[in-house]
């Protein structure tokens, strides 16, 4: 059975005019009759492309300031007509078949993102006729072709040129899927926006918009199927949010290496987000979602060497992230010293790429340089639901902390405290981090009691022959008892940074004073589960 359908009449009505003129010219060259509306029709006519206004075709003018343009039986009848079935009805009602529709919708997302956008502004940018045409055409994809993305114009023209002016069912079905995805995302954005306005029309005029709508809609696009999930008996895929434009594992370009695994992606995300916290040349090495070595250096090579020194054993098979351009010297040091799963950096020099190319399995990602932090949400799946929260972008500086001990931290201790606090934010709770001279000395992660995390950090440092004496310690949450302070003092810690807020804070501070330690409170917790 021949599933090719010729394109003889097309309706073009787009908000984003990118590529539409060239597309219309190509359709006209193939003998396609063009219908259009408003600004799109004017653009085509002004450039010499023959076009029929939809209002002339329907015999009904655009009304209500353009709110009603294409909602007419001659439009939707022409789109929805089943070829070989509805011809008599079409003839009785003077309806002509419309074989292709190219539509993109009012820019609702851009409108509501603009500063000063009102509810009235948002309402006027809710497209009605566009989504209706899109859904009608997609529903009847057996006979009609829908395009919602300008990137598909060339594809359709190429197929028409190769098939005597026709499109194939395979292409029409693929485009129909894209169309339904498009309208679903569009309606989801509108529902989310309106959901944050509850109760916009209540009697209580004093209310703030909610960040969390009463129903939450999102659309993620599959980037790749994964070999398996967290474990080999689990299937998995990687989906990305195409609306977020920031340097991330989701937007990174893979330059070489084997396909990323589920665990690679999760660990790379942890490493990259951690290294973003630092302005100086920095390196973060992650294993099983926890930093096992973090350091700052005069350059990336020094930062890597120092980060690796923290825990060479755990660094084996780890993920390495940098906050600057990866150079050949640093790349050489990595591949000569250790087995590495993934290397990610804002940029990778050609010389570095040439060095790593000898290790064909090493995955190398280039994510681009990041700017300011982007506001977004974190998701956590629970059985039967989804937890949403602000992404933890909180961070304190020297001017934000409060010294609560008798002894003041020295300038070098305070610098290490700030470094250590940034690392602790990315260690699984209960998190304890030892650091000295902007380098992690020991990391205690994921213990059920805070004192044991402190002990683990000390054990890790001792195992690697690192000197803990006069190091600083960060704790992601307050100490419920003084035992964690005592353990730190026994290990040689000189200064502690922690949120504070325990009912036993006075006892904790007294313990620090007893050991001659300095202690600062941040007033901010960084649990990570």
Swiss-Prot record:
GO cellular component, one term: cytosol
NCBIfam families, alphabetized: PRK00881.1, purH
Full protein name: Bifunctional purine biosynthesis protein PurH
InterPro entries hit by this protein: AICAR_Tfase_dup_dom_sf, Cytidine_deaminase-like, MGS-like_dom, MGS-like_dom_sf, PurH-like
Similarity field: Belongs to the PurH family.
Biological pathway: Purine metabolism; IMP biosynthesis via de novo pathway; 5-formamido-1-(5-phospho-D-ribosyl)imidazole-4-carboxamide from 5-amino-1-(5-phospho-D-ribosyl)imidazole-4-carboxamide (10-formyl THF route): step 1/1; Purine metabolism; IMP biosynthesis via de novo pathway; IMP from 5-formamido-1-(5-phospho-D-ribosyl)imidazole-4-carboxamide: step 1/1
EC number of this enzyme: 2.1.2.3, 3.5.4.10
